[in-house]
């Protein structure tokens, strides 16, 4: 889900200055009006289930170290803080926020805010990867994702088709 289809609150600046973004660029908060800006990505899914929620951002030394990201899912809300000065671990583009259950609902969303941040907050893209239960590793307690397998087909492809239909 690209920033171009997300709902913005406050003034965000479009940029392509730092590489590592998805699609045509990313947004930043111009390091101003802290606490008054947010960007909400509505989760577009064809059916409910478990999803690995991932956020992308071009990292850099002048980025926020405590960017709040709230995942609004079927079981409530979960706030996660990400350090945008560090490179994302997935393909050097995405960082996982965790696995959450979503239903096909208007409420399902991911929101990045500037509340309590210093330096630049970056908003690029969000993707949801469907997760299926497997019988392997179900007894392992070392990983919160034990017994789960991330399916290679990304829900982002479906969302991109939906965006194209809306244009």
Residue ranges and their predicted role:
Residues 118-128:
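Edge beta-strands of jelly-roll/beta-sandwich modules across compartments, strongly enriched
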Residues 74-105:
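Extracellular carbohydrate recognition and processing domains
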Residues 6, 97, 126-128:
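Extracellular beta-strand elements of beta-rich domains used
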Residues 110-120:
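Short beta-strand-plus-loop segments that form exposed binding edges in beta-rich domains
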Residues 59-79:
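Short, surface-exposed beta-strand/strand-loop-strand elements in extracellular ectodomains
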């Amino acid at each position: 889900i690209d920033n171009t289809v997300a709902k913005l609150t406050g003034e965000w600046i479009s940029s392509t200055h730092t590489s590592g973004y998805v699609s045509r660029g990313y947004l930043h908060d111009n390091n101003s009006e802290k606490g008054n800006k947010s960007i909400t990505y509505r989760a577009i899914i064809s059916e409910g289930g478990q999803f690995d929620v991932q956020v992308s951002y071009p990292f850099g030394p002048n980025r926020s170290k405590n960017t709040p990201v709230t995942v609004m899912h079927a079981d409530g809300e979960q706030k996660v803080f990400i350090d945008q000065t560090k490179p994302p671990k997935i393909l050097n583009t995405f960082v996982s926020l965790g696995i959450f259950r979503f239903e096909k609902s208007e409420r399902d969303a991911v929101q990045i805010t500037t509340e309590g941040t210093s330096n630049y907050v970056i908003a690029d893209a969000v993707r949801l990867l469907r997760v299926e239960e497997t019988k392997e590793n179900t007894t392992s307690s070392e990983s919160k994702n034990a017994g789960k397998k991330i399916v290679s087909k990304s829900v982002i492809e479906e969302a991109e088709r939906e965006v194209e239909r809306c244009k």
